[in-house]
Amino acid sequence: TENRVLRVVGMPSMAPDFDAISVLGIQWIEPRLESSGNSLKFCVKTRRAAKSFPKTSPEVNFEVGSRIMNKLSPKGLSVNIKEAEYVLEIEIGSSETVVFDNREPGLRGLPVGSSGNVLCLLSGGIDSPVSAFMMACRGCRVHFVFFDNQPFLGRGGYDKVLSLAKKINHFQARGILFVVPFQDIQGAIRDRCNEENRVVLYRRMMYRIAAEIADRQGSLALVTSESLGQVASQTLENLAAVSCVTSVSVFRPLIGMNKESIISRAKEIGTYEVSIVPQPDCCSVFMPKNPVTRSKIPFLERDEEKIPWKELCDDALAKVEIIKVDDL
């Protein structure tokens, strides 16, 4: 109908029907007015996306509001812009006008994909899904890499990460999960390297492999879930010792958050209940009795010389399983 009207010769413009909008507003407000005991404060708020519209927002508010008041003020309706109990909202576009009265708050942030792709190291714990979600809120399309150790841990961790990736993917779509077999690397580190360095050495290998996947897949940064000082591997010295193995940027959204805040966010996004299902993750295998808290890079490099780490990483990369999370 609108297009037909606009194609009529001699028709200079077309405007929203204030009478029709007012009738709709009355239909919505009247039941609320009755349920509130015939006393309700209301206002009209207009937003003009089409700035060419001839009336200003306050003028539209007056046109619609006065019509509604003429009908409902005898029944107890009053205008109160600052303390309105009911708000009728109008958005005027170039081709249509939308009227609504219930604005639900969204997640805000930036549109997914507008900031590029990142690759998140996803475990079965509480923290890493929250990191992934926070990066999605900043406009990143988040892909995932999981370091699997089924020979030592069974399939439980694998299935758990599939569930977590699916939950995070609800906020973005088109995420990809890369599953890396990690058992050979962990076995070599366990058998040949100093026990106290195990966890940091695991992480260095993970970062190297993740960086290579990110480069091949087109992700511009890695995302991890470290929170400074939360566990022994997350001291400044250990984070530096891990980060130095790659030139790819590493984002740590949780670095200044405490555990309570992270848990609260996990509950909000629906990942907490999955994360707390008992299941050891990759880094918990062969945990040292006294893990190093202030590792020295030369000592780590000396440990790595004891194993064919480049060949082990290349072999793991050749066996990566690629899963489209949308298909889960």
Where in the sequence are the language-model features?
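Active-site adenylate/phosphate-handling loop in enzymes that bind or generate adenylated species
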Residues: 67-68, 103-115, 182, 186, ...
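A conserved beta-strand->alpha-helix junction
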Residues: 164-191, 279-281
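Generic secondary-structure signature for well-ordered alpha-helical cores
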Residues: 73, 166-174, 212-220, 267-271, ...
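A short alpha-helix-loop-beta-strand transition element characteristic
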Residues: 270-278
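The feature marks non-catalytic terminal segments
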Residues: 277-328
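RNA-binding accessory domains that recognize and position tRNA/RNA substrates
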Residues: 1-119, 132-176, 244, 292-297, ...
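Hydrophobic/small residue at the entry helix of a nucleotide-binding pocket
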Residues: 126-127
